[in-house]
């Protein structure tokens, strides 16, 4: 058996050592202590009092260092030199020790720890261990009634319990890498070590072993109907529980006295073998453990940490042990769930201090689930490593004043838990302990003697010195710089960026397919498919109106299917969805009007513009022109994304208003005059054989055409429908011909109902109803459920609401054009070179639209693991543009709104999360399968016409509205699990717009509001709103032809903002431009270098693991330079004590 044995370092538990620690001397250095002591030197009776009943130790004192070296009166000058050496160190010994322990970052992460605390319960002459609390991330307690678990909550610990825990680890038995596989063997080894160190009398071996091997009763689900005997037994157990309130003291005393009398003989007769035979713990997990549903909350490959605390009457001093097994082992029924145990903490103490023992147990249990301390516990080499871990934990502790907070209030788990990476990587005192939400705090403000030195009354004075630190607005930590990936580095080689994109994406190509085989992909396919066909039909119809059906719905369907599937198959970022966009539609309309007004053939002219634009895109790819995207900051992203979102919202509402115009409501309807309302078809005044639509049928079930009729006089005009009447030249006569109130109102119900239901189902994921998987399923398929619901409602009412029109035959919309556009023959020769100029405008539009969307998709907060491919994406957009121009299909570019929706539908979260912990955002399921299937389904949708024609158009308008609103909120992405360091620089446009309507006291606690004046934030937002208004006006007027140039102008406007705002302000509300980043980085490097030189010349910080409380008033010329340190210290200890 290989055991790393640790000496206790301190003898038996008595209080004489404690009294010797405070020698009577008038002028002495500050005393190094481990428990809070009175600040005033005149109250020496308190210094000699009984503090905890546990052994007190010196903080900052190593076991191999004599006590007199720091506190003895005869230490002399060497003591002062030693103190100055400690003070001059800018990092604490605990920090250096932890850096040595956790220095290797390339090691595999340690398993997640499930911690369970059991308390010893007495019931007459019987004893058992009862589960009282458990931890994965947050604490869950067994409620007083014992029937249920409490809600997960943040553990609130008393500072005293942490100090006593530190003492326990210093004085108790610590066994690291113990090679034992069962609980009896572990207990034997622990007891043997205690006897060997003189911490336990040999005659108590069997008694301690008997107690530790009692049965463990876990909090399991009990039946609703229980017998009266069971209820009475539980009540009596509750009354006699040693962990209850002080009012239960007498019954506890009687039970323990009775237990002593009944079992004293048994304890004396037990031998080693008998103690093993009296083991009540099963060696293998029982059925209840295996069927425990709580296992779903525990991550895979987790290990357990068991905490056993209790009081017994035969011990005079506490029995303390901390054990780490060399290999985790199943200890049978010790743990609630079948998880192997790696750590064991035992605390048995004399009777009368059950509450103190429970608090110590809660303290060690909370520490074991702390990310940093758990790593220390796994890698600790000796006792001092564990104590250093506690010291670091205390560095981060925040104390709540007892008069301002009720400790009985359970703190709800935060929605976002700060990462422990910063604590693991940074142990410098200058970057520790950001209190009360201060971000990037600098050093503490110069405090007085009371504030910095802690000479004030109770802890509050100590906190004032460090809390009033200098804001990071002056010289403190700035938000993360605008990171530019290697994809946007200018190579200087011909097609250099494209070649690098291909090299980066080629290794990921196979995984792009098998990563898509997941049930989440099904919901994403259905969602994006409905959005794509809605977009194709809507923009196809608008293109047909704008180009006299040279491009219609059929061309839109086929072009979307062909361009989208090829792009998803070969592009650099397959999560981007290609579609027709509003800017492209505007340009197409202007181009058709120009061609028609100048007698040019529209399709041929468009072909040459498309070819020139494709060549220009390839030139941009060859010269690595995409590197200018690094100048696209959040200012440009927010402006462009907001504009596209507004276009979606505007078009959806405009379509709905159009339904009210086409199916108007009779506002003057009077029920009393209902008999006067009628509408009939009247024959035209002059009837001849000239028909308006010769192929139209006479009636819905009549196939005969009007060519078979000799004249129209034989028609019964009153039997014709509205459409037929108008087609044949008839007139509608009556006062109710224009009013169809049911269709307009029903269309609005379908429109708003689809939007509202989709939004509600999306939010249902964060509700408290139903299990997590059910809520996730409902949220993923919210669009599908909403469409099916309101299609069913429409079918039930049977109203003739406008339905989706899908062509059922694959042929061009105009019969006078084919599927190939000839490049020559219809326009003058000068048109071919002259088309370069409009092609340049198209190229600017394509480049900006494509690359801004790519920047939004490739944001760092989306946590994409596979490389982006800006050059490769633009290459394929150019190729597809030339192909679509030859076939007479619409041009396609990245659709911002649908791409954001695609990202949102493929987000991944942790499958298991600790109770009370929000699911962590893991990233996006990066693959090509969903996009390819979506566009294939779009192409074959022409064969699904019988099904798709049942979908009402108002339902699709509701989907459009949801996509616009969701993308408007999607601009604020980064709230779902991204690191706090990223959150500091996120300044959503919409959130800043809301600040105009909020009083300062009600404004959210955004990080940028702490560092940038509100008037500067408002000015920045007004500039964005002005740019957005200019873009909207240009889009809606005849000046829309320069719309692409104005999008490029957003980058110029952002460049000019450098002359209005400081780089500090822009770093918090936007991003710093690349050349400015370099200057800021150089300045920061110089500042750090200067600060480092200053630290070498003058000490800045004391070690945080040493508490210095001067026992005499601080004089104007203090010894050892303590006064200077008190004014400069910014250690987190000044906040805590």
UniProtKB/Swiss-Prot annotation:
Matching InterPro entries: Band3_cytoplasmic_dom, HCO3_transpt-like_TM_dom, HCO3_transpt_euk, Na/HCO3_transpt, PTrfase/Anion_transptr
Gly residues bias (residue ranges): 438-471
Cytoplasmic side: 1-521, 588-606, 763-773, 848-866, 909-928, 972-1016, 1058-1137
Protein name according to UniProt: Electrogenic sodium bicarbonate cotransporter 4
Cross-referenced PANTHER family: ANION EXCHANGE PROTEIN (PTHR11453), ELECTROGENIC SODIUM BICARBONATE COTRANSPORTER 4 (PTHR11453:SF20)
Compartment(s) of residence: Apical cell membrane; Basolateral cell membrane
Polar residues bias (residue ranges): 65-91
Record-annotated membrane-spanning stretches: 522-544, 556-587, 607-628, 743-762, 774-795, 829-847, 867-883, 889-908, 929-948, 954-971, 1017-1034, 1040-1057
Reactions the enzyme catalyzes: 2 hydrogencarbonate(out) + Na(+)(out) = 2 hydrogencarbonate(in) + Na(+)(in); 3 hydrogencarbonate(out) + Na(+)(out) = 3 hydrogencarbonate(in) + Na(+)(in)
């Amino acid at each position: 058996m290989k055991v790393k044995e640790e000496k206790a370092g301190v003898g038996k538990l008595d209080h004489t050592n404690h009294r010797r620690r405070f020698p009577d001397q008038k002028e002495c250095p500050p005393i190094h202590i481990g428990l809070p002591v009175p600040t005033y030197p005149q109250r020496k009776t308190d210094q000699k009092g009984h503090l905890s009943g546990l052994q007190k130790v010196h903080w900052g004192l190593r076991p191999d260092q004599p006590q007199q070296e720091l506190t003895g009166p005869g230490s002399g000058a060497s003591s002062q030199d030693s103190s100055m050496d400690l003070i001059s160190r800018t990092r604490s010994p605990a920090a250096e020790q932890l850096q040595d322990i956790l220095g290797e970052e390339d090691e595999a992460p340690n398993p997640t720890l499930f911690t369970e605390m059991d308390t010893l319960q007495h019931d007459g002459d019987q004893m058992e261990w009862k589960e009282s609390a458990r931890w994965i991330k947050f604490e869950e307690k067994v409620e007083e009634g014992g029937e249920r678990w409490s809600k997960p909550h943040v553990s609130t610990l008393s500072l005293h319990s942490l100090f006593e825990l530190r003492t326990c680890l210093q004085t108790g038995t610590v066994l690291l890498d113990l090679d034992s596989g069962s609980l009896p063997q572990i207990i034997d080894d622990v007891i043997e070590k205690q006897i060997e160190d003189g911490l336990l009398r040999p005659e108590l071996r069997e008694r301690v072993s008997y107690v530790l091997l009692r049965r463990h009763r876990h909090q399991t689900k009990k039946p609703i109907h229980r017998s009266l005997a069971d209820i009475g037994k539980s009540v009596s157990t509750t009354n006699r529980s040693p962990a209850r309130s002080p009012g239960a003291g007498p019954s506890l005393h009687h039970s323990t006295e009775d237990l002593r009398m009944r079992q004293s003989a048994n304890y004396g007769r037990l031998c080693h073998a008998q103690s093993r035979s009296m083991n009540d713990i099963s060696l293998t997990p029982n059925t209840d453990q295996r069927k425990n549903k709580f296992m779903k909350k525990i991550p895979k490959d987790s290990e357990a940490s068991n905490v056993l605390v209790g009081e017994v009457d035969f011990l005079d001093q506490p029995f303390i042990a901390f054990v780490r097994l060399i290999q985790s082992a199943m200890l049978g029924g010790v743990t609630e769930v079948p998880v192997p145990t790696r750590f064991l903490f035992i605390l048995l103490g004399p009777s009368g201090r059950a509450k103190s023992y429970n608090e110590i147990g809660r303290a060690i249990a909370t520490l074991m689930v702390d990310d940093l301390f758990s790593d220390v516990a796994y890698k600790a080499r000796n006792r001092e490593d564990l104590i250093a871990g506690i010291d670091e934990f205390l560095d981060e502790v925040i104390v709540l004043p007892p008069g301002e907070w009720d400790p009985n209030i359970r703190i709800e788990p935060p929605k976002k838990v700060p990462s422990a990476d910063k604590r693991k990587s940074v142990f410098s005192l200058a970057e520790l302990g950001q209190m009360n939400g201060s971000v990037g705090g600098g050093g503490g403000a110069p405090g007085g003697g009371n504030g910095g030195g802690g000479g004030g009354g109770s802890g509050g004075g100590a906190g004032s010195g460090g809390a009033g630190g200098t804001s990071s607005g002056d010289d403190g930590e700035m938000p993360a710089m605008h990171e530019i990936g290697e994809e946007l580095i200018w190579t200087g080689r011909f097609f250099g960026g494209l070649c690098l994109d291909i090299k980066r994406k080629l290794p990921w190509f196979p995984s792009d397919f098998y990563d898509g085989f997941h049930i989440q992909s099904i919901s994403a396919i259905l969602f994006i498919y409905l959005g794509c066909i809605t977009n194709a039909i809507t923009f196809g119809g608008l293109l047909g109106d704008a180009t006299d059906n040279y491009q219609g719905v059929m061309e839109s369907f086929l072009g979307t299917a062909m361009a989208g599937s090829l792009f998803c198959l070969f592009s650099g970022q397959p999560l981007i969805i290609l579609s027709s966009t509003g800017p492209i539609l505007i340009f197409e309309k202007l181009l058709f009007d120009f061609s028609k007004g100048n007698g040019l053939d529209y399709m041929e002219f468009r072909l040459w513009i498309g070819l020139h634009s494709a060549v220009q895109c390839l030139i941009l790819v060859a010269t690595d022109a995409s590197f200018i995207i690094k100048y696209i900051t959040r200012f440009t992203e927010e402006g462009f994304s907001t504009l596209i979102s507004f276009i979606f919202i505007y078009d959806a509402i405009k379509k709905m208003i159009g339904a009210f115009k086409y199916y108007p409501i009779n506002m003057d309807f009077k029920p009393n005059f209902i008999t006067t309302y009628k509408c009939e078809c009247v024959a035209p005044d002059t009837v001849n054989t000239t028909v308006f639509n010769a192929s139209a049928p006479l009636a819905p079930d009549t196939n005969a055409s009007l060519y078979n009729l000799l004249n129209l006089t034989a028609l019964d005009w009153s039997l014709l429908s509205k459409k037929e009447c108008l087609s044949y030249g008839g007139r509608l006569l009556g006062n109710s011909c224009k009013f169809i109130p049911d269709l307009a109102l029903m269309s609005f119900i379908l429109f708003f109902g689809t939007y509202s239901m989709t939004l509600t189902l999306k939010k249902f994921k964060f509700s408290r109803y139903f299990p997590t998987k059910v809520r996730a399923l409902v949220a993923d398929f919210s669009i599908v459920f909403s469409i099916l619901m309101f299609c069913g409602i429409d079918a039930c009412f049977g109203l003739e609401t406008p339905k989706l029109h899908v062509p059922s035959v694959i042929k061009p919309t105009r019969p006078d054009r084919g599927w190939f556009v000839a490049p020559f023959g219809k326009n003058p020769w000068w048109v071919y070179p002259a088309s370069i100029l409009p092609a340049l405008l198209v190229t600017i539009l394509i480049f900006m639209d494509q690359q801004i969307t790519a920047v939004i998709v490739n944001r760092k907060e989306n946590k994409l693991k596979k490389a982006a491919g800006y050059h490769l994406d633009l290459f394929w957009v150019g190729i597809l543009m030339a192909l679509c121009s030859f076939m007479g299909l619409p041009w396609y570019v990245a659709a911002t709104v649908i791409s954001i929706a695609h990202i949102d539908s493929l987000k991944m979260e942790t499958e298991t999360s600790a109770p009370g912990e929000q699911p962590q955002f893991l990233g996006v399921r990066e693959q090509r399968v969903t996009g390819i299937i979506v566009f294939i389904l779009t192409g074959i949708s022409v064969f699904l016409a019988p099904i798709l024609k049942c979908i009402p158009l108002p339902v699709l308008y509701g989907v459009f509205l949801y996509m616009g609103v969701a993308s408007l909120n999607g601009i604020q992405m980064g709230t779902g699990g991204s690191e706090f360091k990223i959150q500091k620089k996120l300044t959503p446009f919409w959130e800043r717009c809301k600040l105009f309507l909020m009083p300062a006291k009600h404004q959210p606690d955004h990080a940028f509001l702490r560092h940038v004046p509100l008037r500067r934030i408002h000015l920045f937002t007004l500039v964005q709103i002005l740019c957005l208004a200019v873009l909207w006006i240009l889009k809606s007027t005849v000046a829309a032809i320069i719309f692409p140039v104005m999008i490029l102008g957003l980058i110029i406007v952002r460049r000019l903002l450098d002359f209005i705002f400081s780089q500090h302000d822009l770093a918090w509300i936007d991003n710093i431009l690349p050349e400015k980043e370099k200057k800021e980085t150089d300045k920061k490097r110089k500042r750090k270098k200067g600060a480092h030189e200053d630290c070498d010349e003058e000490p800045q910080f004391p070690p945080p693991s040493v508490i210095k409380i001067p026992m005499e008033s601080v004089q104007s010329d203090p010894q050892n330079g303590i006064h200077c340190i008190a004014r400069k210290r910014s250690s987190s200890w000044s906040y805590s004590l």
